Amino acid sequence: MNRTHDRLHDGQAGAVGMMIIIWLVVVVLLGVTAIDAGSIAFTKFRLADVASSASTQAANAFRSSPNVSSACQAAEASILVDDSSAKLAKKGCVVDAQTGVVTITVRKEATTIIAGRLSFTKHFTKVSATETNGPTSL
């Protein structure tokens, strides 16, 4: 009777150990997912600030000399200063010559632990932000 009782407890100990391992794996996966999501969100918010600053710089440059090319160059310079890993998107600098309002679109890949390495989640790491601003009034 004692041996049967010990075997029963051995089987339960294995099941409990397996449940602990499964729960630890689930907790780790949830933690990594939360960190990746936070990184993507932070990158999106930061990129919006970069785009806003660049659009303001470009609008001010356009007000100083109404040249679309120099305004877009000012935007690129602002982006480089604010975040060297962010890039101005193709056709990401649009200047309304009538109003002096500039729309800037900036792209960047968020740094993640897992999302950037998996093909079905990689597109979530490619972040873009578009901001529109006019020249500052002094």
Predicted segments with their positions:
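Short amphipathic secondary-structure patches
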Residues: 55-110
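Residue-level preference for non-acidic, small/hydrophobic
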Residues: 51, 104, 129-131
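Compositionally biased, intrinsically disordered low-complexity regions
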Residues: 13-19, 94, 102, 118, ...
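Low-complexity, S/T/G/P-rich flexible repeat/linker segments used as non-globular hinges
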Residues: 2, 112-138
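Alpha-helical assembly-interface signal, strongest on the long, hydrophobic N-terminal helix that forms
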Residues: 2-73
